[in-house]
From Swiss-Prot:
Pfam families: Ribosomal_L22. Belongs to the universal ribosomal protein uL22 family. Part of the 50S ribosomal subunit. HAMAP family: Ribosomal_uL22_B (MF_01331_B). GO terms for cellular component: cytosolic large ribosomal subunit. GO terms for molecular function: rRNA binding; structural constituent of ribosome. The gene is rplV. The keyword RNA-binding applies. The keyword rRNA-binding applies. This is Large ribosomal subunit protein uL22. It comes from the Bacteria. InterPro entries: Ribosomal_uL22, Ribosomal_uL22_bac/chlpt-type, Ribosomal_uL22_bac/org-type, Ribosomal_uL22_CS, Ribosomal_uL22_sf. GO terms for biological process: translation. Keywords: Ribonucleoprotein, Ribosomal protein, RNA-binding, rRNA-binding.
Length: 110
């Protein structure tokens, strides 16, 4: 059994929102997964679609895989670094804003 990976690190998307999309395509055939991502309104869907397309291209180019046979064997989204920012509030105060990032890992195989 052959498996091919693709990763995207440091994406400006929270891991929680990325996991919502990743859970929808885990275990599906790649053409079905691409179709789900194509019509999903979520921001994470477009990002994960790019990573999945990269994994498919890697499988085709590096391993000579047949695209029709490929499935999303594993997909997971991990928490990345957090950018801490401040926004001005009333009476000279400031509130912290944390800008989340994540790492996306996709593996396709037979």
């Amino acid at each position: 059994m052959m498996e091919t990976k693709a990763t995207l690190r440091g994406v400006r998307l929270s891991a929680q929102k990325g996991r919502l999309v990743a859970d929808q395509i885990r275990g599906k055939k790649v053409d079905q997964a691409l179709n789900i991502l194509q019509f999903s309104p979520k921001k994470g869907a477009a990002i994960i679609k790019r990573v999945l397309e990269s994994a498919i291209a890697n499988a085709e180019h590096n391993d000579g895989a047949d695209i029709d046979e490929l499935k999303v064997t594993t997909i997971y989204v991990e928490k990345g670094s957090v950018l801490k920012r401040f926004t001005a509030r009333a009476k000279g105060r400031g509130d912290r804003i944390s800008k989340q990032s994540c790492h996306i890992y996709v593996t396709v195989g037979n």
